[in-house]
């Protein structure tokens, strides 16, 4: 029996007709094999119709994975108390012959596939399987990658309808030519709160060879929403093989003089200011997380992989995040996850208003002072609690850029690190190679006391992508360098650091980043000059003073400028030593990396000879 004949036996007539309409034997074989293996009681195939999406939304409520809140279209979902984040220990890239890659949790492919198949055999008995079709990137475009998701979680399917563009018609259009990703997920057995029960058997395995990801015994979005960070591993590999970039970056529009629109991408490790940069109220957002960048006629063009936001809700407050706050209080479709609910209203940590002393949260019935099994006090919401919402509901979204099948020209790329004493607030690279190596490939994030218990530890995180890397870091960087060489017009590269401190005091205010963005926009078009330093170009005082007045209506003093933009030679040299040591331990790193780092070291040493350890920007401007 061929796959279609098997599917005709497995599906009811209506669902079978939906699958049959897609002329792709490879898809049919995949569906037949997994429906037979998972043994669901019922299968629902989603087309692009609003009715099918509505069915999934209803099933999330019907099966108890989501519950309605007071505001229309708002629902809440809870994950198991111990299923609240990406499970790094049980997430592995499957590689043949037990191959290993630096910084990546790998597993022998044959072993991994055998284990996951055993865990998934018959796991959907008594459950409904949803077959959903989506695309990564805008539809019918150079960026489009089709994907099919199998899941028994209506919550996961519902999340994907909010976050991704529907792809059923795209599968029909592409037919046999579709090179599609596959995702197979089961939440496994559920407890009385409808959360995954068998967390000891939680596995997330990424099979690069078949471009398939398996996820089992988990519901948390980062482990289960196939098209997000799971697909990201697949697209990184595809991009390296095909010569484009799949990046952990926001995509935003910065509005320049006389109505000029300039687009920037930005890669920042967590807690480094990525979302707050992308959400500056008077600029425009295209995407907050993942960006594809392709070379088109010698120009780098970027597109948002997604169409929605799966955002961290902790700390969202009306003063610092007016746009997100406004969206979260509108009657638009939103899934809140792992927040506190009292009388149908959601509450979360550090929201800037009074939080009730009791209610329900990810731990079940909650009261202030409640402790978990380990004796830790349980906060009102989990620190990784989320909101899932479509970007179309953001007043500052650039819809035209979001849906443009040609993407937008990338004028600048920003790498955002976090340290108290090394990088200046903003600088521009001398050229593509210098930016890729001394900014992107050298990205570090200084941990705060809250995250690791040790303040001031610098975590190496090149391009903010290390957690999701699926190829050798050397191959990834080689592709980056090559990508720039292919372009007739390379985006300018910038590095930012919002976290400088002196004697324990912050040197910058939260909104100063709005000024750095405007300066970068002017530099992309050559509208202002800059000061050449050993580590790149920095702004001139007069330009920043004008921008602070224009953008923030603030006086900007020469003292502030000097403190922020002095070149800190000892710290910069120590950083080069750290980064070089890391890359020396890896094989297969482009030789160019060491050459560019050495050139920077020599420039710093020469400058120290002339000016000393700490160099005023005014001294360099006078040259």
Swiss-Prot record:
It is found in: Cytoplasm. GO terms for biological process: cellular response to glucose stimulus; gluconeogenesis; glycerol biosynthetic process from pyruvate; oxaloacetate metabolic process; propionate catabolic process; response to lipid; response to starvation. Binds 1 Mn(2+) ion per subunit. It catalyses: oxaloacetate + GTP = phosphoenolpyruvate + GDP + CO2. Its cofactor is Mn(2+). GTP binds at residues 271-276, 386, 418. Its EC number is 4.1.1.32. The active site is at 272. Pathway: Carbohydrate biosynthesis; gluconeogenesis. InterPro entries: PEP_carboxykin_GTP_CS (IPR018091), PEP_carboxykinase_C (IPR013035), PEP_carboxykinase_GTP (IPR008209), PEP_carboxykinase_GTP_C (IPR035077), PEP_carboxykinase_GTP_N (IPR035078), PEP_carboxykinase_N (IPR008210). Optimum pH is 7. Keywords: Cytoplasm, Decarboxylase, Gluconeogenesis, GTP-binding, Lyase, Manganese, Metal-binding, Nucleotide-binding. Optimum temperature is 80 degrees Celsius. Thermostable. Half-life at the optimal temperature is 53 minutes. GO terms for molecular function: GTP binding; manganese ion binding; phosphoenolpyruvate carboxykinase (GTP) activity. Pfam families: PEPCK_GTP, PEPCK_N. Substrate binds at residues 86, 220-222, 270, 384-386. It is an enzyme of class 4 (lyase). Belongs to the phosphoenolpyruvate carboxykinase [GTP] family. Involved in the gluconeogenesis. Catalyzes the conversion of oxaloacetate (OAA) to phosphoenolpyruvate (PEP), the rate-limiting step in the metabolic pathway that produces glucose from lactate and other precursors derived from the citric acid cycle. Homotetramer. This is Phosphoenolpyruvate carboxykinase [GTP]. It comes from Thermococcus kodakarensis (strain ATCC BAA-918 / JCM 12380 / KOD1) (Pyrococcus kodakaraensis (strain KOD1)).
